[in-house]
Amino acid sequence: DCLGWMAGCDFNDNKCCAGYVCKKHPWCRYDL
């Protein structure tokens, strides 16, 4: 199971769904 838009991911990209990043913030966001 992966986390989608604005889900809490604790700075761990691996928790986010494909296309989302979490490196510099605590939420999954679009990888622009």
From Swiss-Prot:
SUPFAM superfamilies the UniProt entry points to: omega toxin-like
Tissue: Expressed by the venom gland.
Keywords: Disulfide bond, Ion channel impairing toxin, Knottin, Neurotoxin, Secreted, Toxin, Voltage-gated sodium channel impairing toxin
Pfam families, sorted: Toxin_12 (PF07740)
Cystine connections: C2-C17, C9-C22, C16-C28
Localization of this protein: Secreted
Gene Ontology CC: one annotated term: extracellular region
GO molecular function terms attached to this record: ion channel inhibitor activity; sodium channel regulator activity; toxin activity
Similarity section: Belongs to the neurotoxin 10 (Hwtx-1) family.
Task of the protein: Voltage-gated sodium channel Nav1.7/SCN9A inhibitor.
Protein name, UniProt field: Mu-theraphotoxin-Se1a
Native source species: Selenocosmia effera
